[in-house]
Amino acid sequence: MFKFKKGELTDMAKALFAQERAIKRLDGWFIAQETIMKTSGKYKSKEIDKANTLLETVKILPLSVSENNIFVGTQRDSFARSYALINPSFKVEEFNGYCDPTAVFNDIEPNEEFTSERIRTVRQYMQNTDYVKTLSEVYKKYESDTKEVAYFIEQVTGHLIPDFRYALKHGVLKMIDGIKDKEGDGCRAMELALQSVIVLADRYREILENQLKDAPQNRANQLEYMIKTLERVPRRGARGLFEAIQMFILLWQVMCLEQAPNPFAFSVGNADRIFAPYYDTDRETATELFEHFLVFFNVADRSWAISQNIILGGRDVDGSDLTNEVTYAIMDAYYNMNLPQPILSVKLHKNTPKEFYENMGKFLFTPGVLTPSFFNDDSLFEILKSHGVDSEDLPDISIAGCQEPLIMGKDNGNTTNSWLNLPKILELTITGGVSLVTGEKLADIKKAPLENIKEEFFKNTKYFAERMADAANGASKAVSHLRVPFLSCFMGGFENGDLVDVHDFDGYPMGIGFI
């Protein structure tokens, strides 16, 4: 690796974050959607067609590398300035869910390059896709329920944890070689989609080679090492921590781009265990590398890529602790940077070492520093095992999004797909389905006498819950139109060529949320 002074990479990471926070426009997602409009329909197979549009997007998407980057890659092009709860224009009284999947086009400010006509053309195309038409039918059917949020549903993208471990160890070329002789559109789509990350790496390498021509010596040393790294990964497996982080970032970038715009809450999983096989340096150096890794997850002026989670610690099936040196290096990176994203979570159990608690103490007793979310790994083992999770998968329990426990690479819990609003249901029970806000009749239910309100409330809750389940399943069926051949490579599809049928899903249990 290139030589650097202690703290030099930390300073670069902080400067890189400052540059990211200065970004006020996010246009890459629009370019991705426009590319889909221009290139889709070439193949009869929807799976292969989606893989081709992903590859074409990677070929033309504008790329850049800052003088403060030591790793190339960004997830900026997958997100829009849209997420309600961190959007300054968000008003609670106007929220009724995410009913219009093309509303994201309101979040791009027209200018000379992205004209109103250009935006309108892509939006009109998207409105006529199978995905949007199916989803619009669902929202229209249940509009009276969601109008004032007796419940709301979401068309969930993201919200799971890919398993990149095989790719990190063996490289993408071996994955392509392992699937090229298998039959089926799914295999052809995954083979094509995997080529996207190679194309992306080559494009970044060309940028670095151009920057190298007139770079000062210190930066030239960094650029030469970065170029050398991209000659190795993602084609072949990582040999050390630097290569592993770089490869992970590129895989993540393509995965998010495949589900643009706004694949919220994709999460890393047990990062300490993912990177432990590649730990080839000291803790201080690893910390500075992971500081750059953490900056990667922050998008523009409000860190728009929300609820991406990294978890540390935990146990194996015998109860032995799995903490390692990478655990503490990542903790140090989190503490030093104190960034708004990604979320830090930790798994605790009866054999968690004292050193782990001591390292957490600096988060808990330093004012103004983020604090990790705590998860009882012993309890998670028992609960998920009782719900059908295989024992061999339990050490891979990780958190996707805010607090949703999933199995890395095997579990699409579809979390945040539906939210039941019990206070609103109570209101409608008391009023006989009439809104206290507008006076409008929202539901065909009778007004409950106060002396019998509990029984009627439970009956109405069951009524709305059943309707919510039907609506939520409708949203999931709509999302099934959005093929994800690249992501499927890291969710079990690589082994069998399966892109998952939403009508015949045999994964782990799903759940709903309450508000």
Predicted regions, residues:
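Low-complexity, highly charged intrinsically disordered N-terminal segments
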Residues: 190, 201-204, 209
